[in-house]
């Protein structure tokens, strides 16, 4: 068997990133974008500052922000956010427009 090629460090001399780093950063951008639609930006800035004070500018900080924002958004949607169907009784099933097979 041949060994997997080793990753070369970037040309600017910084240490190489792990493969999942880009994914974590991309997910954080998406969640922050969604959180800004539902929460006060000052609150999100304060949250980011608090997590930065605990974890510094690390990948662990990004993961912690993702965890906290996911929980906050889930709770917000369950409480009946007007931008979401989760927790709301009005509005029909979005899948009801799809016809079911006759023999079901």
From Swiss-Prot:
Gene3D superfamilies: 6.10.210.10, VpR/VpX protein, C-terminal domain (1.20.5.90). The modification Phosphoserine is found at residue 84. Residues 1-20, 83-104 are annotated as: Disordered. Keywords: Activator, AIDS, Cell cycle, Host G2/M cell cycle arrest by virus, Host nucleus, Host-virus interaction, Modulation of host cell cycle by virus, Phosphoprotein, Transcription, Transcription regulation, Viral penetration into host nucleus, Virion, Virus entry into host cell. It is found in: Virion; Host nucleus. One of its GO terms (cellular component) is host cell. Coiled coil: none annotated. Interacts with human UNG. Stimulates gene expression driven by the HIV-2 LTR. Prevents infected cells from undergoing mitosis and proliferating, by inducing arrest or delay in the G2 phase of the cell cycle. Cell cycle arrest creates a favorable environment for maximizing viral expression and production. This is Protein Vpr.
